[in-house]
């Protein structure tokens, strides 16, 4: 029942936690996020409520294959970030959803107050687990296919602020043909500036 009511309670709980340290301590293990993880019989989390499944952050981290990892993957827009989300899910990575306006302030607040959390949006970067590292053959001029594609795109865009990377990705047919990567800290600064200026956030000047 608590999970079913969470969407209505979440804004008040999150704002209250950010404004009152004692309240934050009391609710730290009660804060839920929708997750891509499947419910497991006999396990308390993820909790199924309607069409969604919910988890606490501590349970998320307990399910990580690397117990030393602090990284928590999150998605703010299931449609706009669909390619990156699908790619991570294809490698069995769990992703939480932080889609409300308050989450743009709540996640950085959690990082600042809880040393065990480090949040990374699904479209922030591509780590080794997502790359399909295969040796490439060079042509007669010594240029690989990746370098040829990179140069073609770079010439077409003609924008020095955009970094072009050509990489083979895992995921087979589900892998997106192209992605825009927005480095986490740069994007957060851009989003904060947009919030202060009361405008919709756009792409940072520099992106990949």
Task: Report residues per predicted region.
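Conserved GHKL (Bergerat-fold) ATPase module
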Residues: 1-208
């Amino acid at each position: 029942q608590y999970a079913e009511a969470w969407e209505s309670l979440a804004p008040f709980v999150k704002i209250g936690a950010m404004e009152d340290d004692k309240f934050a301590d009391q609710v730290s293990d009660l804060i839920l996020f929708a997750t891509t993880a499947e419910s497991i019989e006999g396990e308390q989390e993820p909790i199924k409520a309607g069409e969604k499944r919910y988890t606490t952050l501590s349970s998320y981290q307990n399910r990580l294959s690397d117990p030393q990892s602090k990284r928590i993957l999150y998605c703010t827009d299931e449609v706009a970030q669909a390619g990156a989300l699908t790619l991570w899910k294809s490698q069995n990575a769990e992703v939480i959803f932080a889609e409300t306006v308050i989450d743009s302030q709540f996640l950085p607040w959690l990082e600042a107050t809880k040393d065990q959390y480090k949040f990374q949006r699904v479209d922030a970067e591509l780590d080794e687990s997502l790359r399909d590292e295969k040796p490439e053959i060079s042509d007669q001029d010594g240029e690989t296919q990746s370098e040829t594609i990179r140069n073609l795109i770079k010439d077409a865009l003609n924008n020095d602020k955009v970094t072009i990377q050509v990489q083979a990705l895992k995921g087979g047919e589900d892998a997106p043909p192209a992605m825009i990567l927005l480095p986490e800290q740069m994007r957060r600064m851009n989003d904060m500036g947009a919030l202060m200026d009361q405008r919709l956030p756009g792409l940072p000047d520099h992106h990949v």
